[in-house]
Amino acid sequence: MERKTLASLCFFLIVLLAAQVVAQIVPCKTRNRNFKSACIAVSGDNEECDHDCRRVGGWYGGSCKNQKCVCDC
């Protein structure tokens, strides 16, 4: 009986650790609502978006995605 319990506990811990690793891999992105113009990466807006995300939003940075400024949280 103890072996079965120990095996179940080990399996549960492995599943729990695997779930945490998967949760950490998914990047956090949020749209910057303060960036009013269309965000076009080739026009220099990428740097403005990054700066705006860092300065105004307090995020880690940002970039243009689908003409929207998206911040990394």
Curated annotation (Swiss-Prot):
InterPro entries: Scorpion_toxin-like (IPR003614). GO terms for cellular component: extracellular region. The keyword Signal applies. The keyword ATP-binding does not apply. Residues 1-23 form the signal peptide. Coiled coil: none annotated. Induction: Up-regulated during nodulation, but not by Nod factors or pathogen infection. It comes from the Eukaryota. Expressed in nodules, but not in leaves, stems, flowers and roots. In developing nodules, expressed close to the infection threads. It is found in: Secreted. GO terms for biological process: defense response; nodulation. Disulfide bonds join 39-64, 49-71, 53-73. Keywords: Disulfide bond, Knottin, Nodulation, Secreted, Signal. Nodulation-related protein probably involved in the infection process. This is Nodulin-1.
